[in-house]
A protein has these predicted regions:
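Solvent-exposed edge beta-strands and adjacent loop segments
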Residues: 2-84, 124-142
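Acidic-leaning, charged glycine-interspersed low-complexity segments
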Residues: 97-133
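Charged, amphipathic alpha-helical segments
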Residues: 77-99
Length: 178
């Protein structure tokens, strides 16, 4: 059942990520990505290619828009070597990280969970992830993420699912009247 009106999804979402599940389904083990820099999170639909067929005199004869993709962008602050290594699938050795790759090779799942109950969140089950570790004297080490949905292997899995955040279940002692 849809809600009549949505709660505004003000800042401070919780973003979790992990390996994608079987056939492109949402992963079963997702972990918090860490502290997110203020006002860096965005999730938007990027429209697909538009094909247009014109006749003489620039008369539009036919038009077709292809499916788009969702793009999630955010920046993780206070990044540690362990955090950087984890996203690249590398290991830290004696307080050093040999950056043998700058590519996230495996598809990942993401959830964007809003702070407020009743606000809209998103599940992105099968994504390409581009990350950029960055150092600036004003912020220290950060990790910039750009996540793009891909078509899951299974046709029964949607590239993105929007949901309304529900209240957490009350403690069992409250529900039993104790």
């Amino acid at each position: 059942m849809a809600t009549a009106s949505a709660v505004t999804a003000w800042g401070k979402p919780t973003i979790k990520s992990g390996a994608s599940g079987e056939s492109g389904a949402i992963g079963t083990t997702l972990e918090d990505v860490g502290k997110i820099k203020e006002n860096t999170t965005s999730l938007e639909l990027v429209k697909g290619n538009v094909n247009e067929l014109f006749g003489e005199g620039h008369e539009l004869v036919d038009k077709m828009e292809l499916e788009g993709t969702w793009t999630l962008k955010f920046t993780v602050i206070k990044a540690s070597l362990d955090k950087i290594a984890k996203f690249f699938g590398l290991s830290v050795s004696t307080d050093k990280l040999a950056m043998k790759t700058t590519i996230v090779s495996e598809p990942r799942s993401y959830t964007v969970d809003p702070l407020l109950v009743g606000a809209i969140g998103a599940e992105l089950p099968y994504c390409y992830t581009s990350i950029t570790p960055k150092f600036a004297t004003a912020e220290g080490w950060t990790i910039e993420f750009e996540v793009t949905t891909m078509e899951p292997e299974s046709e029964s899995v949607a590239p993105a699912t929007l949901y309304v955040k529900k209240a957490a279940a009350q403690a069992s002692s409250q529900s039993t009247g104790k």
